């Protein structure tokens, strides 16, 4: 079976007026199906750029990226959009929930975009159960929830299209330590159920939950 994610000699250079900035410098690595890994590094090291590349939100300057054996540079914009929508779930530090929609509607939003259908309440409730959000909150709006509860909603939204890969950018960065630990416990449960999870973090306590850590400094993998 092909790795779910594979980088081969990937370089990303951002041209600026002050001069080119190399965000990723000849990066090569693989992520197998079902792995739970963390990406660590100091601010500006390239770890968020790496996550962006994994999510097909940007293209490399050179090198190749494969998602489940498919080389992204061979795919059209429409194919890349479908790949992101169908196979990749995104979880961010800032929850990016819609304040005027209730929790069921927020969770259902990616599915509504996919099929242009009405809210699939049954599916939304299924994933909300999976992230252990109390049922009495389902008709509330995000601003009525705590930070930890909002992050659970964001995770449920990422799960609703049953992605192969979950990409998480500092998922506990906006939470207190106790709430952050509960979110990482949830991630561990999702991993045990077969999810491939990649977490960008600066927090070594978060990295302890994962199976292995990729450390990146100045755009290069150092361990």
Regions found by a protein language model. Give the residues of each.
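ABC-type ATPase nucleotide-binding domains, specifically the catalytic core motifs of the NBD
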Residues: 15-17, 108-120, 130-132
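Conserved ABC transporter NBD signature motif
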Residues: 63-71
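Conserved ABC ATPase "signature" region
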Residues: 70-71, 119-136
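Short coil-to-helix segment of the ABC ATPase nucleotide-binding domain corresponding to the Q-loop/switch region
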Residues: 101-108
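Conserved ABC ATPase signature
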Residues: 141-145, 149-151
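Conserved catalytic motifs of ABC-family nucleotide-binding domains
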Residues: 162
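Catalytic Walker B motif of ABC-type/P-loop ATPase nucleotide-binding domains
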Residues: 166-169
């Amino acid at each position: 079976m092909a790795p779910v994610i594979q980088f081969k000699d990937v370089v990303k250079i951002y041209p600026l007026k002050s001069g080119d900035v190399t965000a990723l410098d000849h990066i090569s690595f693989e992520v197998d199906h079902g792995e739970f890994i963390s990406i660590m590094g100091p601010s500006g090291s390239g770890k968020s750029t790496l996550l962006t590349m994994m999510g097909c939100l940007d293209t490399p300057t050179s090198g190749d990226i494969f998602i489940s054996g498919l080389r992204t540079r061979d795919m059209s914009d429409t194919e890349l959009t479908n790949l992101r929508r169908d196979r990749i779930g995104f979880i961010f530090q800032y929850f990016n929930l819609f304040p005027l929609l209730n929790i069921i509607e927020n969770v259902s939003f990616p599915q509504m975009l996919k099929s242009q259908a009405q809210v699939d309440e049954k599916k939304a409730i299924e994933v909300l159960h999976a992230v252990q959000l109390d049922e009495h909150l389902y008709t509330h709006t995000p601003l009525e929830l705590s930070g930890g509860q909002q992050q659970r909603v964001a995770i449920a939204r990422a799960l609703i299209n049953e992605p192969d890969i979950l990409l998480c950018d500092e998922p506990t960065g906006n939470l207190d330590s106790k709430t952050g630990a509960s979110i990482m416990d949830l991630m561990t449960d999702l991993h045990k159920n077969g999810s491939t999870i990649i977490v960008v973090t600066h927090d070594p306590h978060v990295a302890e939950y994962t199976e292995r850590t990729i450390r990146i400094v100045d755009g290069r993998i150092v361990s």
